[in-house]
Design a protein with these regions (language model features):
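Short internal beta-strands
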Residues: 91-94
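Short secondary-structure boundary/capping elements
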Residues: 71-75, 99, 139
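Gly/Thr-rich phosphate-binding loop signature of adenosyl cofactor/nucleotide-binding cores
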Residues: 1-83
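Charged, amphipathic alpha-helical linker segments immediately N-terminal to NTP-binding catalytic cores
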Residues: 98-130
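Pre-Walker A adenine-sensing motif
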Residues: 137-145
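Short, surface-exposed connector motifs at secondary-structure boundaries
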Residues: 84-89, 108-111
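Conserved small/polar residues in nucleotide/adenosyl-binding loops
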Residues: 148-155
Length: 155
């Protein structure tokens, strides 16, 4: 019995949910998502990274955008630099949020794709998690052989 881990490519997610590509470095569609959960990076944009899992899809909604909007340009760049340096697979902007120039510059520097959707943050979070739970569910592959033998007649 062998348990195999699975991944979902960003290209598959873009196709499945019709995400807009705001920025995508060369070959980003092949990036594999291996975690079946997502994160809203509000605490990380405020500077708190304890227990942060950088392997999750990061979804930035209106709350995070409003917080970042109140920062100076230099501080915005610093916060996005710190987030992208962790190696997150993608930043997804919900509600058709405009990308901050500082966010785009930091993403380009670190090669982090930025996607966008018009869906509400909570809606797209739940839909993505449900999709990933199915696609990344553990599976077992068994190899077997069935052999039938008839009893030999005894005298």
């Amino acid at each position: 019995m062998q348990l195999k881990e699975f991944g979902v490519s960003l290209g598959d997610l873009i196709h499945e949910f019709n995400f807009e590509v705001v920025y995508g470095p060369e070959g980003f569609e092949k990036t594999e998502i291996t975690k079946d959960d997502v994160n809203r990076p509000g605490l990380q944009l405020a500077g708190f990274f304890d227990y942060f899992d950088p392997n999750r899809i990061q979804i930035m909604g209106k709350v995070e955008s409003s917080y970042v909007e109140g920062l100076s340009s230099e501080e915005r760049r610093s916060r996005f630099d710190r987030l992208f340096e962790t190696g997150i697979p993608v930043l997804l902007l919900s509600r058709n949020i405009d990308v901050f120039p500082e966010c785009l510059a930091a993403a380009q520097e670190d090669g982090v794709p930025i996607l966008r959707t018009n869906e509400f943050t909570s809606t797209i979070m739940s839909v993505i998690v449900a999709f990933l739970k199915v696609k990344l569910a553990p599976r077992v592959t068994l190899h077997g052989c069935l052999l039938y033998t008839s009893p030999s007649p005894r005298d």
